[in-house]
Amino acid sequence: MSNIYANSYLIVFVFLCLGVLLPIGALTIGRWLRPNVPDEAKATTYESGNIPFHDSRIQFQVRYYLFALLFVIFDVETVFLYPWAVVYDQLGLFALVEMIIFIVLLAIGLIYAWKKKVLRWM
């Protein structure tokens, strides 16, 4: 019986090794075979054929990332709330209590973000 489990893990290990080694091998072979001709024009930013005036990289302030992260968190909340609301009648009291706990935890996170003034745009 343990031989069956060992064979199962062996197959998973083989696929894991293949999944890691094949992309690494393909990238390595591609690096060896491609022509490498560095040029200043290749390193510049492409702006519709125009010569760029300055560096195209713009640094965003951290608060924009926090705002986007909060948006993603509450967007995922709606993904969980919608199916629950659709089948609310069939789930019963246990699912209602679980969803209330979920909403309370997210509300605590929202209140914390509000107190830390993450939601203040300017």
From Swiss-Prot:
It is a multi-pass membrane protein. It catalyses: a quinone + NADH + 5 H(+)(in) = a quinol + NAD(+) + 4 H(+)(out). Its EC number is 7.1.1.-. GO terms for molecular function: NADH dehydrogenase (ubiquinone) activity; NADH:ubiquinone reductase (non-electrogenic) activity; quinone binding. One of its GO terms (cellular component) is plasma membrane. NDH-1 is composed of 14 different subunits. Subunits NuoA, H, J, K, L, M, N constitute the membrane sector of the complex. This is NADH-quinone oxidoreductase subunit A.
